[in-house]
Amino acid sequence: MEKTCADEFPLTVDSSEKQGVVCIFGTGDFGKSLGLKMLQCGYSVVFGSRNPQVSSLLPRGAEVLCYSEAASRSDVIVLAVHREHYDFLAELADSLKGRVLIDVSNNQKMNQYPESNAEYLAQLVPGAHVVKAFNTISAWALQSGTLDASRQVFVCGNDSKAKDRVMDIARTLGLTPLDQGSLVAAKEIENYPLQLFPMWRFPFYLSSGLCVFFFVYCAIREVIYPYVTGKTDSTYRLVVSIPNRVFPITALTLLALVYLPGILAAILQLYRGTKYRRFPNWLDHWMLCRKQLGLVALGFAFLHAIYTLVIPIRYYVRWRLRNATITQALTNKDSPFSSSTAWLSDSYLALGILGFFLFLLLGITSLPSVSNMVNWREFRFVQSKLGYLTLVLCTAHTLVYGGKRFLSPSILIWSLPSAYILALIIPCTVLVMKFILIMPCIDKTLTRIRQGWERKSKYAQSTLNGKSDI
């Protein structure tokens, strides 16, 4: 016979491990899962229900009573019902006075109501100590015990003692409570579970746009042009050849765009002469998305590496190699060895391998489990110094790939240069601008600005002895 979820966990604990009584209003999925977890951790659980006689599938060892009776059994009450059903609490206002009322509700969409559910609850039951908590934990995670992905619990409330009690409960359940302040923060906490990759949207849209643009650009040069001029069918290039051009171009462009906002911010600070003015919203959001941009770029670099590995087994490549070998045998002609070509080929491969290795290192150090083990200087060294070195290597990899064809007019098709030349525009611009910013005369002033000096401040004169480096 198959065991139920409640049977899979031992719910019997010693009296010395008893934590107290907790009341849960609501017998839905979340209420039952939270009650089961509390029973496992030694709490006595009393459920409050509008129909206690018909409530079923509750954890073994828990009681089910009506709301008023359940409220009288504990001074900590978890409200596991939706906001639409808060009306019954007005009748229990006297019974709930002085009790800790934990609101775990979420809405269907962000900013659905003018005020947060917790603030509305505090207005509805003014005598209770309302605390917002546990709304970022799913019922499935509580029931299955897989809390690794959602272990943090945001807690906010106006009463510090009530918050401390809720945070103690969270720690007993094996969770990590984070104090977010007063109930004013409840709206932000309620919006948090409703967010869908907010910091990934801009990188996703940008990378998608770049991919589409470069794919169409390469298709015009390598598929449409041969068909228009010579009726040659080159559509097979759409599967491997063109994607293997698009992926590295997109990766290099995104990597450059990771460091471009920092340069723009430095230029803006130099122009303003102060760090105490906010950046434009678009630049601020761009800087916040740099980690996501870098990880997306790393993903495209991985795709480029994988696509490159399958090149030798492609039919087109094997056909060209076999055909060239047969032609060479029939004509009895040998191609002379070119030392310069060998240098370019080996340098191109070496730069690509080193660039990809450092790229991978940047991605690893951006993981929270790794970044938490290093201090700020170490993290900045990897992400900034090694990051720019990665950009230099990847840009050099692309330059050497072009080799002698870089400025050759023969590579123009319908006056369109090769796609890799377009890929070099942003990286080279970033590197040139960075080189200018690290010049001592500019870097010294920028450092002072970031340390609090202001060019137009009345204290700036004495700080720089009446002189500026710019």
UniProtKB/Swiss-Prot annotation:
EC number annotated for this UniProt entry: 1.16.1.-
GO cellular component, as recorded: early endosome membrane; endosome; Golgi membrane; membrane; plasma membrane
Pfam families (alphabetical): F420_oxidored, Ferric_reduct
Residues engaged in binding FAD: 140, 148, 269, 290, 366, 383
Keywords annotated in UniProt: Cell membrane, Copper, Endosome, FAD, Flavoprotein, Golgi apparatus, Heme, Ion transport, Iron, Iron transport, Membrane, Metal-binding, Oxidoreductase, Transmembrane, Transmembrane helix, Transport
Gene Ontology molecular function, alphabetical: cupric reductase (NADH) activity; electron transfer activity; FAD binding; ferric-chelate reductase (NADPH) activity; heme binding; metal ion binding
The protein's assembly and partners: Homotrimer. Interacts with PTK2/FAK1; the interaction may regulate PTK2 phosphorylation.
Function of the molecule: Integral membrane protein that functions as a NADPH-dependent ferric-chelate reductase, using NADPH from one side of the membrane to reduce a Fe(3+) chelate that is bound on the other side of the membrane. Mediates sequential transmembrane electron transfer from NADPH to FAD and onto heme, and finally to the Fe(3+) chelate. Can also reduce Cu(2+) to Cu(1+). Plays a role in systemic metabolic homeostasis, integrating inflammatory and metabolic responses. Associated with obesity and insulin-resistance. Involved in inflammatory arthritis, through the regulation of inflammatory cytokines.
Protein name: Metalloreductase STEAP4
Source species: Rattus norvegicus
